[in-house]
Amino acid sequence: MDEIPAEQVVLLKKAFDAFDREKKGCISTEMVGTILEMLGTRLDQDMLDEIIAEVDADGSGELEFEEFCTLASRFLVEEDAEAMQHELREAFRLYDKEGNGYITTAVLREILKELDDKITAEDLDMMIEEIDSDGSGTVDFDEFMEVMTGE
């Protein structure tokens, strides 16, 4: 379960608990198909049986939370860094209306506000000040990437 990000474990726990109606710490393997469909994956019965056999290590016909996470982690698409960078480049391009390679700090402020409606004006000011250290009022793609990925 180490490879699953903590926030996804929380979501998986909620889903697991929703299917664990009797609150006994396990769910029936018959629910697996339904759960996978909810995660956006549809499998034929043979494939489903094969996955269940692999994941239900103790052959109990029930999945404990740990087994459920093992199963779910196979279908949680972890975006690789390259795909993420591509998506962020596209987003940047959309906001860079003049195509000059930068956006204004005002536009960045709007983007950040859209991403997190709970962010305060003070937090925004601090972030913008940190990003736009030269006070130019603009942000290039590298600076934008730094903000969006925290790297």
Curated annotation (Swiss-Prot):
Domain EF-hand: 7-42, 43-78, 83-118, 119-151
InterPro entries, alphabetized: CALM/Myosin/TropC-like, EF-hand-dom_pair, EF_Hand_1_Ca_BS, EF_hand_dom
SUPFAM superfamilies to which the protein is assigned, alphabetical: EF-hand
UniProt source species: Blattella germanica
Annotated PANTHER family: CALMODULIN LIKE 3, MYOSIN LIGHT CHAIN 1, 3
Record-listed Ca(2+) 1 binding positions: 56, 58, 60, 62, 67
GO (cellular component) term, any one: myosin II complex
Alphabetic keyword roster: Allergen, Calcium, Metal-binding, Muscle protein, Repeat
PROSITE patterns: EF_HAND_1, EF_HAND_2
Functional description taken from the UniProt entry: Troponin is the central regulatory protein of striated muscle contraction. It consists of three components: Troponin-I (Tn-I) which is the inhibitor of actomyosin ATPase, Troponin-T (Tn-T) which contains the binding site for tropomyosin and Troponin-C (Tn-C). The binding of calcium to Tn-C abolishes the inhibitory action of Tn on actin filaments.
Keyword Metal-binding: yes
Protein's name according to its UniProt entry: Troponin C, isoallergen Bla g 6.0201
Molecular-function GO term, any one: calcium ion binding
Binding site for Ca(2+) 2: 132, 134, 136, 138, 143
Signal peptide interval: none
Family: Belongs to the troponin C family.
